Amino acid sequence: MQIPGHIDPVTTGTVPLRGGNRIDLVGLSRDAIGGVLVEAGLDAKAAKLRAKQIWHWIYHRGVTDFMGMTDIAKAMRPWLTDRFIIGRPTVREAQVSSDGTRKWLLAAADGQEYEMVFIPDADRGTLCVSSQVGCTLNCRFCHTGTMRLVRNLGAGEIVGQVLLARDALGEWPKGNMAGFGAGSDADPEDDDADDDAVGHYTADGRMLTNIVMMGMGEPLYNFDEVKAALKIVMDGDGLALSKRRITLSTSGVVPMMARAGEEIGVNLAVSLHAVSKEIRDEIVPLNRKYGIEELLQACADYPGANNARRITFEYVMLKDKNDRDEDARELVRLIKQYKLPAKVNLIPFNPWPGAPYECSTPERVRAFSNLIFKAGISAPIRTPRGRDIMAACGQLKSAATRPTRAELDRIAEEKQAALG
């Protein structure tokens, strides 16, 4: 079945970050780093040791300059600098919401733009990470869905978002290497060597504790790169984020869901948003390919899902579209029919210019939530975050496809006319 605006599988290739003729090591596995070191002239034994050291400096210490890798001999550091880089995305724009939410517009080495968002809470800090430049799914309530798909992000570009966020939050450890001294060949009298006895964090008060793959793009249509990136993020010798603190969100790419559970093993969130074929076909066109019943069966079969690791159903509240009491009751019925260990996140619709929907009233959202709660299923209402900087759920869209000045002027004129 051909879905308007849908490409299956995604045919756009990834573009690796490069520093001129130098290879960017961010996004490479530990073995792959060893491989490029061998290609550059090191013997296999030396390359394996150097790969371990470099990995630690990149992902545990946040270092971007080989000259700062103080357990590597001084003579080796310029050799590495001449051949490799430790890249970061370019920050085109950084914004901070009145509620503390932060949004970055990032540019890849080829100039393509994408966004990431950090959401601080009292007990956690969540980074919303993008997996593609644009999106192919055309979900009608989503601003990203109005973009064309440009390309997939590479593993390095995905991991780079996490590294950049940790840079911005100032939460890389300082001090010694926390026991990573084995195999060091640094000069013990090296003036550059670290002196601190104990590593510590210098965060600005809100640490990055959770990652959600809910930024731009459909993660399961960039499976291999997302998998590679999350394996790096979860590696215990580096960023060391538990899989229980990572959530992958999909609009319902059914054939890839089991693989995600088996090969990545993170929490699953599903953009459900409707309980009838007619409405979901309209607002999530992928439903025309993988229907609700097929999707819910894939959820029931998702590896590792249980009452301790529930599947999250995301449900955007659209006025007079999917917010009736009957919709809430049908949602409960479906969850119980498929015996799903699930919770429902109710998301007040976040408006954007030209959006075809309005948000349900607060009273309607509360009534919808209460019906689900009374059936024994958790249905919290998500507090909108970052609306004032277009960073809330469904509002992301890169500057490359933002309105032109003429379009902005036209929108302003229309608003003025409406105000009389």
Curated annotation (Swiss-Prot):
Q: Which cofactor does it need?
A: [4Fe-4S] cluster
What does the cofactor section's free text say about binding?
Binds 1 [4Fe-4S] cluster. The cluster is coordinated with 3 cysteines and an exchangeable S-adenosyl-L-methionine.
Intrachain S-S bonds: 128-393
Q: Where in the cell is it found?
A: Cytoplasm
| Any single biological process term in GO | tRNA methylation
Looking up Pfam families in the UniProt record yields: Radical_SAM, RlmN_N
Question: One GO MF term, please?
Answer: rRNA binding
Q: Which residues bind [4Fe-4S] cluster?
A: 135, 139, 142
Q: Which residues form the Radical SAM core domain?
A: 121-388
Q: Where does S-adenosyl-L-methionine bind?
A: 217-218, 249, 271-273, 350
Q: Which Gene3D superfamilies match?
A: 1.10.150.530, Aldolase class I (3.20.20.70)
Task: Name the InterPro entries on file.
Answer: Aldolase_TIM, Methyltransferase_A, RlmN_N, RNA_MTrfase_RlmN, rRNA_lsu_MTrfase_RlmN/Cfr, rSAM
Which residues are catalytic?
115, 393
Reaction catalyzed: adenosine(2503) in 23S rRNA + 2 reduced [2Fe-2S]-[ferredoxin] + 2 S-adenosyl-L-methionine = 2-methyladenosine(2503) in 23S rRNA + 5'-deoxyadenosine + L-methionine + 2 oxidized [2Fe-2S]-[ferredoxin] + S-adenosyl-L-homocysteine; adenosine(37) in tRNA + 2 reduced [2Fe-2S]-[ferredoxin] + 2 S-adenosyl-L-methionine = 2-methyladenosine(37) in tRNA + 5'-deoxyadenosine + L-methionine + 2 oxidized [2Fe-2S]-[ferredoxin] + S-adenosyl-L-homocysteine
Which EC numbers characterise this protein's activity in its record? 2.1.1.192
Note whether Ligase occurs among the keywords.
no
Gene Ontology terms: cellular component: cytoplasm
Q: What is its main location?
A: cytoplasm
- Alphabetical UniProt keywords: 4Fe-4S, Cytoplasm, Disulfide bond, Iron, Iron-sulfur, Metal-binding, Methyltransferase, rRNA processing, S-adenosyl-L-methionine, Transferase, tRNA processing
Report the function annotation for this chain: Specifically methylates position 2 of adenine 2503 in 23S rRNA and position 2 of adenine 37 in tRNAs. m2A2503 modification seems to play a crucial role in the proofreading step occurring at the peptidyl transferase center and thus would serve to optimize ribosomal fidelity.
Additional observations: Reaction proceeds by a ping-pong mechanism involving intermediate methylation of a conserved cysteine residue.
HAMAP family assigned to the protein according to its UniProt record, in alphabetical order: RNA_methyltr_RlmN (MF_01849)
Describe the family membership recorded for this protein in Swiss-Prot or TrEMBL.
Answer: Belongs to the radical SAM superfamily. RlmN family.
Q: What is this protein called?
A: Dual-specificity RNA methyltransferase RlmN
The gene for this chain is rlmN
